[in-house]
Amino acid sequence: MRTQVMQCCCLTAVALFLFCSMPLLAQRQDILLNNNWKFRFSHQVQKGSEVRVDLPHTWNAQDALSGKIDYKRGIGNYEKKLFIRPEWQGKRLFLRFEGANSIADVFINRRHIGEHRGGYGAFVFEITGEVDYGKENSIWVRVNNGEQLDVMPLVGDFNFYGGIYRDVHLLITDEVCISPLNYASPGIRLIQDSVSRQYAKVRAVVDLANGNNAGQEAELSIRLLDGEKVVAEQKQKLSLAGKSSVQQELTFEINNPHLWNGRQDPFLYRAEVSLWKGGQLADCVTQPLGLRYYRIDPDKGFFLNGKHLPLQGVCRHQDRSEVGNALRPQHHEEDAALMLEMGVNAVRLAHYPQATYFYNLMDKNGIIVWAEIPFIGPGGYDDKGFVDLPSFRANGKEQLKELIRQHYNHPSICVWGLFNELLESGDNPVEYIKELNELAHQEDATRPTTSASNQMGELNFITDAIAWNRYDGWYGGTPADLGRWLDAMHRDHPEIRIAISEYGAGASIYHQQDSLVKTVPTSWWHPENWQTYYHIENWKTISSRPYVWGSFVWNMFDFGAAHRTEGDRPGVNDKGLVTFDRKVRKDAFYFYKANWNKQEPMLYLAGKRNIMRSQQLQTIIAFTNQPEAELFVNGKSWGKVKADPYAILEWKNVELQPGENEIKVVSGNKKIPLVDSFHCRF
């Protein structure tokens, strides 16, 4: 009898889970509206000038990516016809845009319903009272990526692609629902008040809305699920006044929680929040919950769940060749896979909020995230990143609220970034940064703030941690300068938490040289071997200083920058470890893979694209995470060499023969034989 009861309980729990997880049964529908839009520029007013496009879409996939400095920055119009079913009357309808750059005005049946100013956050408008039920309706979106003085960012060393470049959704809910209108957040904020290995206390703050004129009696419940097992559950009855929006809190506790532990164990609970009305399920939203605790020590660096974790990171711009910023899921997945292959455990998503899909991938794979707003200074260019206008200040605060509220529940996010390379001249941003820092703490008391600086000044002492963009050995100086600078900074300011937010050098896979000669960064010659040398020397410096809480290679991927005229082509910043099309991993990628990815045995010969050698005596370099390897040149052994502490193998004065040569390296591990080779001519 007991077995039957247990089986019945299990079946009931599974049925309830399925009931709450299926959008139709849960009274919430999420309909993707990406297909069959008509697009035209603002000057194309003649009928028939539209072209059919599917979203995500940018109108700069050709001009900006070809290095055209004056790529189109203006107004594009998107229109879609949508049949609104008669049975949706009595429901609530919302349009959710994941991203449109940078100003979007939305019209329903040619009536203006709202404007969003900012190109990287999601936004939601309710259209319940604007549509005609049982008829075809028009959705018209006017997008403007032109320069504005009151919308962040004002400047940037990257392309400002125009368009609706992320997904668009139609959300259909009951009149009583978990509201999507709180800065386009999921309507649930999971606040980790206390987390340890023994105990966790979490508050769920839920945004509720009643669209009916009459008051409603309801019940709010939350279940924390580990697979299909209910770990914690809370319920609360409530009364919602007519036409009201309220926040409700539910608190739950967990003993001996399973922690989210980065790459080692990125475990996620599911927090399932349900709203019941008259005994019927009115709405249900599920969010990830990764329980973790962490700190940044000014002397010892970053600690996750009580254990030291050096953050071996990269920066990521969201664009790629041919598609610009209009990425599909497979593009995000490929980027994440390349990062995982290299052994990355942290990423700075620069210089703006990126797609929710990518944050989800970081949660699932245990990669720690630095997320930031697009408050960007001019860097090495003659421009301004801050204007002291009330409208600009307000826009920055709105974008910060969007970032935090939309992405609060992602356990991968551990720091909020507030600015990049600002100047304390002209309109001085220091007081405004203090306001942003205070706002970030008001919005989220659980995460520290940080920023990326490139100069000394008061702005470096505002956020909880600070990082610097350093290019020692690329934009002047030598790689050895980084160590001297870090040590002096730590000595003079032992209280601050120091990271390296950017370091990198340009490289073309088509530019090869025998000798190691530093180039001019702004020239058309970006030899790959200098990038490799740069990263080897900089990583030696960073990895030997535990007080550096994180370091972020600039950049994981080449990215579009239409104004750049350097490297092997205009319009591309080639500091990536992987090419713009994601097809080629540069030599420096494999250097980091050998150092950071100890799980996947690897052996790689550097310089294999240098197929025309000018000198008979060569230095052959390989990277491996194995103890040693043996070099063969034209079948002759040049001996076994043990890998140094930085996973480097080096054979000096290796003699080539005139004509064709085969260079081959073989791992000494017989259980896992590894071989890499290439051919070159002398």
Residue ranges and their predicted role:
Residues M1-L18, L24-H351, L361, G366-V369, ...:
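Secreted/periplasmic carbohydrate-active enzymes, especially glycoside hydrolases
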Residues A100-E175, T519-Y592, N597:
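Long, contiguous interaction/targeting segments characteristic
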Residues E333-M339, A346-V584, A588-Y592, M602-S614, ...:
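Substrate-binding/catalytic cleft of secreted carbohydrate-active enzymes
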